[in-house]
């Protein structure tokens, strides 16, 4: 019916299955020109052996796996892209991408009601249209001309012991203001497509690190927190 109504476009579907006997979906996959994989693109190698003509893409992926989902496409011509869940935040599946603190309601969104959460909070772009640091990292992976981006990870224990869900990323911010944390270690993340990066605090060089593909185009540098100006 799809091809009858519109013969000009390829037909696809997102295969959403967690079964160990993944191969039972081969007949369904053969009906499509493009085969979408929800969270299962790691099965690409064995699938390609069984069906070398299959053209694949990841139709849903976890936000924190940005590098590997880019690498699958970069390294294999039969994988043409990745769709993260999700690009933009939305209402529903409340708290699917939340991080939380020890002592708060635990577990994934499907385990229990996560009130007062009402947004999903798994978007690279948040509910009011602001980009999270993960969005800059993903953008840089897919576009080699993007400038470096500097962000800071919330220290574990600053507000509480951090817990993550399957669709969350560690709370990371474009901020160097952490009162009360003076002298204690804090992690800085720099996303960069150049071979190396230098980190300066109050105009003093504090670290230099490689940022090649081996490092996933990212430097994670731990330094003591000192108020002032951080730049790279």
Model-derived segments and spans:
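Substrate-binding clefts and catalytic carboxylate motifs of secreted carbohydrate-active enzymes
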Residues: 1-16, 26-33, 43-231
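A general structural motif
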Residues: 36-40
């Amino acid at each position: 019916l799809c091809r009858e109504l519109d013969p000009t476009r390829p037909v696809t579907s997102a295969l959403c299955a967690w079964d160990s006997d993944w191969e039972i979906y081969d007949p369904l996959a053969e009906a499509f020109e493009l085969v979408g994989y929800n969270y299962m693109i790691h099965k690409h190698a064995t699938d390609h052996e069984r069906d070398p003509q299959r053209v694949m893409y990841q139709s849903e992926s976890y936000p924190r796996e940005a590098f590997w989902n880019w690498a699958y496409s970069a390294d294999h011509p039969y994988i043409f892209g990745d769709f993260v869940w999700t690009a933009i935040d939305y209402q529903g599946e409340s708290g699917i991408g939340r991080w939380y603190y020890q002592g708060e309601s635990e577990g994934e969104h499907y385990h229990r009601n996560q009130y007062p959460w009402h947004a999903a909070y798994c978007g690279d772009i948040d509910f009011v249209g602001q980009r999270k640091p993960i969005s800059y990292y993903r953008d840089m992976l897919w576009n080699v001309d993007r400038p470096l981006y500097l962000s800071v990870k919330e220290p574990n224990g600053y507000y509480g012991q951090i817990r993550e869900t399957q669709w969350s990323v560690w709370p990371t911010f474009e901020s160097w203001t952490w009162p009360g944390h003076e002298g204690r270690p804090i992690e800085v993340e720099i996303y960069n497509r150049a071979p190396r990066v230098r980190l300066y605090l109050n105009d003093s060089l504090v670290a230099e690190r490689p940022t090649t593909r081996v490092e996933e185009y990212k430097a994670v540098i731990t330094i003591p927190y000192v108020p002032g100006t951080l730049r790279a």
